[in-house]
Amino acid sequence: EIQKVYGDDSVAAYFGETPQEERQKIVSTFQDKGSELRFFVGQPRTGGYGITLHAATTVIYYSNSFDLEIRLQSEDRAHRIGQENKVTYIDLVSPKTVDEKIIKALGKKSELAGKVLGENPRDWLV
């Protein structure tokens, strides 16, 4: 749908079926300041560890997981070394759906981690 509105040249898609040899090319193109890409669409688990998206200014969650660490890893991808932008995070959640329950559960998990591990629980997580 994004491609219909903004055109194919402005959207990069990166999913599980994306061939390994294309993945770094897609990420590098998105990171290039001269790139016409305005959107990077992917799934949190697809990139594996180490993917960097410091060109991002907005992260939109449209598919959520009960695993808090998967979400935090997604946020880290936009906050690696080289990030110069303020990053906004948006949850797309339909009322009375499982996503609404997932978001509530993530909030409770984050709150509990803060109580158990201290002010910055992420320092304890590996």
Question: Language-model segments: which ranges?
Answer:
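A conserved SF2-helicase RecA2
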Residues: 66-126
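Hydrophobic residues at beta-strand termini and immediately following loops
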Residues: 14, 62, 92
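Conserved helicase ATPase core of P-loop NTP-dependent helicases/translocases
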Residues: 6-47
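SF2 helicase motor core recognition
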Residues: 1, 23-24, 38-86
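Conserved RecA-like P-loop NTPase ATPase core
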Residues: 30, 53, 106
